[in-house]
Amino acid sequence: ATFSEAPPGNIKSGEKIFKTKCAQCHTVEKGAGHKQGPNLNGLFGRQSGTTAGYSYSAANKNKAVTWGEDTLYEYLLNPKKYIPGTKMVFPGLKKPQERADLIAYLKBSTZ
């Protein structure tokens, strides 16, 4: 399934998902530091493995995917399948609604 087939995302629900499943390793605010994972500010339109000051796995750099709704929707289903060798230990979000909500929140909070 692709992002175009996903249900509409809810920013507030996405924020809750981010706080419970992502915020222990990621920040979204401009100028916020990296944690276990990179700061996600400016994520949309950026190539994987290119955030300044973060040490990525070779897998993330070599994937060279441009992050957007479609690529994030697929990645967040199963990160280790999408980028074998990624350092991200998160197992993914199986529910299309949760992925759509998280993407809506990320789009709103990282631009």
Curated annotation (Swiss-Prot):
The modification N6,N6,N6-trimethyllysine is found at K80, K94. Belongs to the cytochrome c family. The keyword Disulfide bond does not apply. This is Cytochrome c. Its main location: mitochondrion. Keywords: Acetylation, Electron transport, Heme, Iron, Metal-binding, Methylation, Mitochondrion, Respiratory chain, Transport. The authors placed the amides at positions 10, 24, and 97 by homology with other cytochromes c. There is one amide at position 108 or 111. It is found in: Mitochondrion intermembrane space. Pfam families: Cytochrom_C. GO terms for molecular function: electron transfer activity; heme binding; metal ion binding. Binds 1 heme c group covalently per subunit. It comes from the Eukaryota. Electron carrier protein. The oxidized form of the cytochrome c heme group can accept an electron from the heme group of the cytochrome c1 subunit of cytochrome reductase. Cytochrome c then transfers this electron to the cytochrome oxidase complex, the final protein carrier in the mitochondrial electron-transport chain. PROSITE patterns: CYTC. Disulfide bonds: none annotated. Heme c binds at C22, C25, H26, M88. Gene3D superfamilies: Cytochrome c-like domain (1.10.760.10). The modification N-acetylalanine is found at A1. GO terms for cellular component: mitochondrial intermembrane space. It comes from Fagopyrum esculentum. The lineage of its organism: Eukaryota, Viridiplantae, Streptophyta, Embryophyta, Tracheophyta.
